Design a protein with these regions (language model features):
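Conserved GNAT acetyl-CoA-binding A-motif
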Residues: 93, 99-110, 238-249
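Conserved beta-strand in the GNAT
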Residues: 44, 50-61, 71-73, 78, ...
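Amide-forming acyltransferase catalytic core, primarily the GNAT-like/NAT-type
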Residues: 123-223
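Extreme N-terminal starter segment of soluble prokaryotic enzymes
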Residues: 1-3
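Core nucleotidyl-transferase/polymerase catalytic module
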Residues: 43-45, 52, 58-63, 75, ...
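Active-site rim helix/loop that mediates acceptor-substrate recognition in acyltransferases
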Residues: 11, 18-63, 172-196
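Active-site/acyl-donor-binding loops of N-acyltransferases
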Residues: 118-142, 218-227, 233-290
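Conserved acetyl-CoA-binding loop-helix of GNAT-fold acetyltransferases
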Residues: 76-79, 85-99, 225-237
Length: 290
């Protein structure tokens, strides 16, 4: 068995791993490999003269009390079923950590994988706050009065998204993505028929990233306060449940300020793990291409 970086010539075989392990269709895989794959960010295990396991390592930055440190996010960790049980995922993660010389961050896809990654030296270090807003709550929310528009939903560029995001999530443990990563996250959200807005209101600007799911709306990221989020959802005439994900630190700030009692409906959810660093605790990891 050999571990090496993937090449473009391997893409058809890597797509087979991707499809068999994750079930994604050809059009999405083609989209991903067109926009995010490089021969410097994916490691594969070679067996029988073909790739049989893979892991992509995407660069990011961890904000700490002394600045920030480079990390890599391990994405799409997968092994063909007939080659499992040989420790290939562990080897790929160790090789990535050794090659890039940075801490490794990942999002476990299930609770059982949390225990698996703990055995490999990872620990839970990132979380989010989540809740579901029901249609009645949106209908009862205070919105704009007729003829007095307060919220302007504008197209957001990758540069604007990066700047607004970094200005909002400044706490220790924040995983900062660079412009390339944010550009892809916005492209993928658009591919999934999602929406990304820069919301101008009350002399400030906030972010709102969401997409439509079956009979629901999924807010993947926002910097809006709960009161402003409800007002924007009302302006958009949302009539279905809205599942919201926020930074836990942002929710706690709202609770301390006492501005929005609705923030108390949020529940903490463990979201991401790290190895090779003791700095992060209840940090904020998001836009993970889950």
């Amino acid at each position: 068995m050999e571990i090496r970086f993937a090449t473009k010539e391997m893409i058809p075989q890597i797509k087979e791993i991707w499809n068999r392990c994750f079930g994604d269709e050809e059009d999405y895989m083609e989209f991903y490999f067109t926009h995010r794959f490089s021969e410097e960010n994916m490691l594969v295990c070679m067996e029988d003269k073909k790739p049989v396991a893979m892991t992509t390592f995407l660069k990011a930055y961890l904000v700490t009390g002394e600045g920030e440190i480079p990390v890599h996010y391990a994405y799409a960790v997968a092994t063909l079923p007939e080659y499992r049980g040989r420790g290939y995922a562990k080897m790929l993660l160790e090789k990535g950590k050794q090659h890039f010389q940075t801490p490794i961050v990942l999002e476990p896809a299930s609770e059982s994988l949390i225990y698996y990654y703990e055995k490999l030296g990872f620990r839970m270090a990132f979380c989010v706050a989540e809740r579901t807003i029901l249609p009645d709550e949106i209908a009862e929310a205070k919105g704009e009065e007729k003829g007095q528009q307060k919220y302007w939903l504008l197209t957001v560029t990758p540069d604007e998204y990066v700047n607004l995001r970094d200005a909002s999530f400044t706490e220790n443990g924040y995983i900062r993505w660079d412009k390339d990563a944010i550009t892809y996250a916005l492209l993928e959200n658009d591919y999934a028929d999602g929406y990304a807005y820069k919301v101008q209101h009350h002399g400030r600007e906030d972010l709102l990233l969401f997409r439509e799911e079956e009979n629901a709306i999924e807010v993947l990221e926002t910097t809006l306060s709960e009161q402003d989020l409800l007002a924007v959802l009302k302006r958009l005439r949302i009539k279905v449940p809205v599942r919201v994900r926020k930074s836990l630190a942002a929710v706690e700030r709202e609770e301390r300020a006492g501005n929005d009692k609705k923030e108390q409906g949020y529940q903490k959810k463990d979201f991401g793990m790290i190895t090779g660093c003791d700095e992060a605790e209840n940090g904020y990891l998001n836009l993970t291409l889950e």
